[in-house]
Regions:
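Metal- and O2-centered redox machinery and metal/ROS homeostasis
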Residues: 1-215
């Protein structure tokens, strides 16, 4: 999310649009530090991960994904470049996982108030890079949850199961949309700033200490 204090970042490239792999690889490289920071905060791949810690992560994710996805769904122009935020919504999956894990009514859990503004198409795509990346990486996390906690798609792992067998297809479609829009340096750099901002806001929300539920 661009702000006056946002760090300078290298451009995703000059000249005409690159292919999807190039644009996504550049996004990944320029958000590497923020990505690693949130992974460290969550500890989902830890060999000492507990069910309580996993449930808390789902609560935090629900509180972030729901308001962010609501904003993304207002960017109607995303559908013109092949992205349907409603089809890609994950908040309903998080709500289902929480109910399965006996958290209670997810609708009463607090929502994050400091979320990305997504005030432009480029900012929306940068934000979605973080959310869609969670679905892509969720395939690895899903296997770890099964091995460590016995969590399956049906028993509280639907969010990280994500698109399942369609994960690769959905990621490629997202990459194609990003590439088709990233035709100027300004658009590409705005995507990077939005992705960095989204990672940071998510980490800040997940680092809060107060309990979200009594489960």
């Amino acid at each position: 999310m661009p702000t006056s204090s946002s760090p300078a970042v290298a451009s995703l490239g000059d000249g005409p649009q690159g292919d999807a792999k190039h644009v996504l690889a550049a996004l990944r490289e320029q958000t590497r530090d923020e990505h690693q920071a949130i992974e460290q905060t969550l500890g989902l791949m830890s060999e000492t991960l507990t069910l309580q810690a996993y449930r808390r992560t789902l609560e935090r994710f629900h509180g972030f994904w729901q308001p962010v996805e609501a904003r993304l769904q207002q960017r109607v122009e995303l559908r013109e470049i092949g992205i349907d935020p409603v089809e890609r919504a994950k908040a309903p999956l998080l709500a289902r996982d929480l109910r399965v894990l006996d958290v209670g009514n997810p609708a009463v859990l607090p929502l994050c108030r400091e979320v990305p503004l997504v005030a432009s198409t480029a900012a929306a795509l940068g934000c979605m890079y973080v959310l869609e990346g969670a679905s892509l990486g969720g395939q690895i996390i899903s296997r770890h949850l099964g091995a460590r906690l016995g969590i399956t798609r049906e028993s509280g792992g639907l969010f990280f199961h994500g698109y399942g067998e369609r994960t690769g297809e959905m990621w490629r479609a997202f990459g194609a949309a990003v590439s088709s829009f990233a035709v100027t340096t300004e658009a590409r750099d705005e995507m990077v700033q939005a992705a960095i901002g989204t990672f940071r806001l998510l980490r800040r929300w997940c680092e809060r200490d107060e309990p979200l539920s009594t489960a």
